[in-house]
Amino acid sequence: MMSLDRRRKSKLSSSFIDDIKTHIEELEKRARSRRKDDQISFDLCVEAVIADLTRSLFNETTPWLYRSMRSNSFTGNAIGFKTFRLVIGLMEAAELIVINAGGNARNTFKEPGDGAPAFHPGLATRMRASDTFKSLAIEKGFSADNYNKHFLQIKPSRLVSLRVSSSRHGAIKVNARPMQFEPTEKTEEIRLEVKEINDFLFKQKLSGGVFTGFQRIFNEGDRRDFDWNMGGRLYCLGDNNYQMMKKDARLNMKINGRRVAEVDINASWLTILHALLDAPLPLRGDLYHVKGYDRSVIKGWITATLGFEQFHTRWPPRMRKSITEAGVKMTKRMSMQRVGDAVMSKYPFLSSWPEIDIRWSRLMYEEAMCITDAMRDLRLQGIASYPVHDSLIVPVRNIGKAKATLENAYLSRLGVKCRLSVNRRGKSKAP
């Protein structure tokens, strides 16, 4: 993502940014100088774009950065939509950036009267550094090893975000767009808590992973019953943060020089749903264990179902891929219907899932509240913890305290004891 949250940090990065800024301003050929405030905004945007493009050169996954070009996606940010559009336009003219515009894609297979959508929802605009930009950056001396010496990650200023409900065009899910909201006492309370979390973690040293600061994102803000009680996860900003890493890679991180462990909540949403419906949990064992099926298949079915309003008639492609990557060969007996029958024999209340008035956003909210409650308890003990949605990463020596705070959070809020597993480098302990 082109997050626009990095700034110059050294003489080297300053000269690189200033040289490019001078060059694109010469291309612009303005008749008159910008007003002071407009020039400050322009300079800031150039700096942020160059910082992101330089970082993308050393991204092993993809050189492409994405950025929504909706004007409302810039609301509340230090850099405005018009300024951003101007800067990337000038950089494209200078052949420093390659832009792949987003937007809807025409459905070439649509036939008259077939009911299919005329367009598929498109991707956000993609951008990458051009070969010219790459040559200039490498010639200047930037590398993956020294990037953080020359560019500074700033703390996020927008700590609470709200999105409308997502929608679908046939089988294609359309990502939820940002939604504006008026600040209230409740949103200020949420904002201050996120700020407290960020301030504490920015004082810690996370090695082997990148912490960029959290934003708490709430969902389905356009629902009538929304009251800051849907979604609400802590998301680390940017596309190279520790939350985006594979679990094995995260276990190689260190917190303040100490080895880490990841404490996972076993079947978190399923546990929460049991509590909200006052349904008794099985006395022991892995909640994803159903006789005759690999764990990944049962987890996949439950995850797919609780994230949808109805029962799926076939496996979502992403879930099928996840199962096959776990080494499981999909067979005819693993249809959504047959696996569902097996799951519902263990959890009968799931047979009425489409009629239950609890949706994924409520389950996510309850989980997020338990996670933030546990983080607060650990923080008061001086212990740094880094969430990955349904798990907490802590120093190995604090595993016991992390487990105790998570168990207490679920018990206090939901009246249910969650089951935990601990993953360490070279070791794992199941619930």
Question: How should these model regions be labeled?
Answer:
Residues M369-V388:
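Active-site palm subdomain of RNA-directed nucleic acid polymerases
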Residues S15-N77:
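Short amphipathic alpha-helical interface segments
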Residues I399-P431:
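Polymerase palm active-site segment centered on the conserved acidic dipeptide of motif C
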